[in-house]
Regions:
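Gram-negative bacterial Sec-dependent N-terminal signal peptides
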Residues: 1-23
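A structural "hinge/loop" feature
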Residues: 2, 98-124, 143, 226-235, ...
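Extracytoplasmic/periplasmic ligand-capture domains
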Residues: 25-63, 72-73, 131-135, 148-149, ...
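Proteolytic maturation boundary segments
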Residues: 36-37, 41, 70-81, 85-100, ...
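N-terminal lobe/hinge region of extracytoplasmic solute-binding protein
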Residues: 67, 71-151, 182
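Surface-exposed binding/hinge segments that line
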Residues: 196-286, 661
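Middle-to-C-terminal accessory/interaction subdomains
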Residues: 624, 647-652
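Glycine-rich and polybasic anion-binding loops at the starts of cofactor/ligand-binding domains
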Residues: 642
Length: 683
């Protein structure tokens, strides 16, 4: 008797008594036609027993006919057992939008480069403990089967799926979550500093594992937003202990000896080769980072729970195949994903990427596209047999100044709020909207929260946004920044020549936006130059405190801020996003031992962020703390907002079960709410 049959007997008996009907094969229901099947507890998905009860059926499982071939391409994977032994006892049943899919095909993606412009493609295979449903309001199970909070939001318990397996067939258990937290997320030998989502008011949690299917997060103080953080964050709170743990010296006394067999100095070097000393899930694998050692290693990449896994990686791109142990099925019992392969190619030139989209050489793209690309894509969508959606965004283009510049004269200037106010009102947002965004956007100040929550005074997002070049000039005059040599451009208050150098990457902001803003600043006498660089060059300069100006999109929904306070703590976001105040961050991280002490308003904002996260959702306390955060953000204009406008989502019409997105946004992790494991290719 199989595991499935054993669990089925109980549910079948109960349901047949209620319905008075015989069991049958499960019907091919879709969201477009549910065939009388009642909705489940969560939108578009059921646990197996719940679906069988609702549909009055007994599910028979089937797999991709290519799956053994695909499995053979995954280095280190053994031969496959039967499908029922590869699925958990309660697989997640996904109801497709429009049609039951067919297997096969290759999803073609394009990114800027390794770790650059990749998150839209990453999200296609992404999983986490939970996710947001496509309404972007409802948190639903994903890897976890269920969850439960205690009364004061200081303990969050997850139930995992019994029998769930990693992509190499090893059991996935609560130990893999604890390994991620204790031995990776909190281990400074692996990740230098714990990320904000892994802490509660800057203090660590503890993780208990009462049994293989139960994970308990114990919080030092309330953090109701922790669940939403899991639903949106790119990082995955589980790692294969059975594999990576072998190379961790805290878990295996022979870790360094094992690593030395393949030419690594320590076991931690092997973990770095696989995991990258980062929680970003597309850091280069050993196939790219350690080509001379990868043949010796047991696997080319560490096992995953995602829908697809890497099999090849070069500087030109990457290839993936379907995970033969993936935990989702469709209503007829077909194991997901439908699509057998994924190919990602790199093109850092924006014009090259657009041309490939126009020619139909890419199946899905949203990241690094700007509204400026919309006309040519819309003009060609019928001929090219693709669809372009203009969807609302959450983040908007923002600018910042290096308030801890190594150049002391610049540091003093950039740290002066009057300078930042002047540079904000120097921007003609209405013209910027018409020129760069075809009049489709809304001029706004950056307030961190997006969309604007009800607890924020609408006037807050208007602070220092009214175009006032004369006022900007007067403010610059007032801080002693005047033109002393008659060349039309202002010198520093001490009289030294000043040129504002703006470097930008099209992954983070449109070139047309940067060019216009630079012209507005030059128009009020601040000489500004512009240079496009690669995302890697931009991030490297930002990390080394070498940028004059930060230029990248920014903004997060309330649900994310409830779980991650990075927008209010120096450097005010992560490595892949928009940062400033790098030496403030060093001071915070070192508890004042090094770096530069931030001003009091920054320290107050950090405390208010803790208060916001610790308050009950919807409470007066939360509203008051949130309003203070938004006001402080706008008043101090550390980040200057511009225009919030819709942006482009592209997909080829051959990609089926592709629905309209509520937003074009990284903040809900792009495709993750829309279950791309249901996509299939039909030419």
């Amino acid at each position: 008797m199989t595991r499935h049959t054993r669990t089925l007997l109980l549910s079948a008996a109960a349901t047949c008594l209620m319905a008075g009907t015989a069991w049958a094969e499960c019907k091919p229901v879709t969201m477009a036609d549910m065939g009388g099947v009642a909705p489940g507890d969560f939108p578009q998905q059921y646990d197996l027993s719940a679906f069988e009860a609702a549909a009055g059926c007994e599910m028979t499982f089937s797999a991709n006919p290519e799956i053994e071939t695909l499995n053979a391409e995954i280095k280190g994977n053994p031969d496959l057992p039967p499908l029922e032994e590869r699925l958990p006892e309660e697989p997640l049943v996904v109801v497709p939008y429009d049609a039951i899919g067919t297997y096969g095909g290759t999803l073609r993606a394009i990114s800027n480069a390794t770790e650059a412009g990749t998150s839209d493609f990453l999200s296609v295979r992404h999983v986490n403990l939970v996710r947001y449903a496509d309404d972007l309001q409802t948190i639903v199970p994903n890897v976890a089967k269920s969850w439960e909070w205690n009364d004061d939001f200081t303990q969050l318990t997850f139930k995992l799926r019994k029998g769930h397996k990693w992509s190499d067939g090893a059991p996935f258990t609560s130990a893999d979550v604890k390994f991620w937290y204790d031995n990776i997320a909190l281990d400074s030998k692996v990740i230098e500093k714990p990320k904000g989502y892994a802490l509660v008011a800057d203090k660590p949690m503890t993780v208990d594992t009462p049994d293989d299917e139960t994970v308990v997060f114990n919080l030092p103080s309330p953090k109701p937003g922790l669940l939403a953080s899991f639903a949106t964050v790119y990082a995955q709170p589980f790692l294969p202990k059975h594999f990576l743990g072998e190379y961790h010296p805290d878990l295996n006394a022979d870790a360094d000896t094992l690593a030395a067999e393949c030419g690594f100095a320590t076991g931690l070097e092997v973990i770095s080769a696989y995991y990258g000393n980062s929680d970003w899930t597309d850091t280069p694998t050993p196939m790219l980072k350690n080509p001379d050692q990868v043949d010796c290693l047991p696997k080319s990449t560490y096992p995953t729970l995602e829908s697809h896994i890497y099999t090849a990686e070069t500087t030109e791109g990457r290839k993936l195949v379907a995970n033969p142990y993936f935990f989702m099925v469709d209503p007829t019992g077909q194991q997901l994903p439908y699509i057998s392969r994924q190919d990602e190619t790199y093109a850092n030139d924006n014009e090259v990427r657009i041309l490939k989209l126009v020619n139909g050489e890419v199946d899905y793209k949203s990241q690094s596209l700007t509204l400026a690309a919309a006309p040519i894509l819309l003009e060609n969508q019928e001929k090219g047999n693709f669809t372009v959606q203009l969807a609302p965004t959450i983040a908007m283009p923002t600018f910042s100044f290096n308030v801890t510049s190594e150049d002391m004269a610049k540091r003093e200037l950039f740290g002066n709020v009057e300078f930042r106010k002047a540079m904000s009102v120097a921007i003609n947002r209405d013209e910027l909207n018409e020129t760069a965004f075809f009049g489709q956007g809304v001029p706004k100040q950056f307030i961190a929260f997006s969309p604007t929550p009800s607890f924020v005074d609408p006037e807050t997002e208007k602070m220092y946004t009214e175009y006032d070049p004369d006022g900007a000039k007067a403010m610059l005059d007032g801080i002693g920044m005047v033109d002393t040599d008659g060349d039309g451009f202002r010198e520093l208050p001490g009289g030294a020549k000043f040129v504002l150098n703006v470097q930008f990457a099209t992954q983070g902001i449109g070139g047309e936006v940067v060019e216009l803003v630079a012209q507005y600043w030059s128009d009020v006498g601040v000489q500004t130059t512009v240079k496009e660089v690669t995302p890697d060059e931009y991030r490297s300069a930002q990390s080394s405190n070498q940028l004059d100006v930060g230029a990248w999109e920014k903004g997060q929904p309330t649900a994310i801020i409830m779980g991650n306070k990075e927008l209010f703590v120096p450097p005010f976001e992560n490595y892949f996003a928009h940062r400033t105040g790098m030496l403030w961050a060093e001071w915070v991280d070192s508890n004042g031992a090094s770096g530069v002490e931030p001003p009091e308003w920054v320290k107050t904002m950090m405390a208010d962020a803790d208060a916001f996260q610790g308050a009950m959702p919807g409470s007066d306390e939360q509203a008051a703390a949130g309003a203070k955060l938004a006001k402080a953000t706008a008043e101090n204009v550390l980040f200057i907002g511009t225009v919030q406008a819709p942006n482009v989502i592209y997909h080829r019409n051959a990609v089926k079960n592709f629905t309209e997105f509520k937003t074009q946004s990284y903040e809900y992790y792009r495709t993750f709410p829309y279950l791309p494991a249901q996509w299939f290719i039909q030419e």
